[in-house]
């Protein structure tokens, strides 16, 4: 089953969040990007557990734009291995989904 729309999650340093969110919307790679300013992340990196304050971007977009969105974000993202993951939208408000189509 193919899904037309997806939600993309991107973690980033807090000071980079707005720049990346603006890039996504300005390039019409996402209809909307929400910024959750501060999350606590705990993860494995280079053999040890790390803890950081990060921001979480939540992007609503079309699935066919994901690869382009990923490549554009990787160009400006400061992390060596940025989290850029997509989850399908399996159902939603039809008016909102239409707005995604019209906005990106």
Q: Model regions: which residues?
A:
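Positively charged, small/polar-rich N-terminal and surface patches that mediate targeting and assembly
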Residues: 1-104
């Amino acid at each position: 089953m193919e899904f037309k729309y997806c939600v993309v999650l991107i973690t980033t340093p807090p000071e980079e969040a707005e720049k990346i969110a603006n890039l996504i919307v300005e390039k019409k790679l996402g209809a909307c990007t929400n910024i959750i300013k501060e999350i606590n992340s705990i993860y494995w990196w280079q053999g040890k557990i790390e803890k950081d304050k990060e921001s979480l971007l939540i992007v609503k977009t079309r699935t066919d734009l994901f690869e382009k969105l990923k490549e554009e974000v990787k160009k400006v993202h400061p992390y060596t291995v940025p989290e850029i993951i997509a989850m399908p939208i399996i159902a939603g408000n039809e008016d909102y989904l239409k707005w995604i189509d019209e906005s990106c």
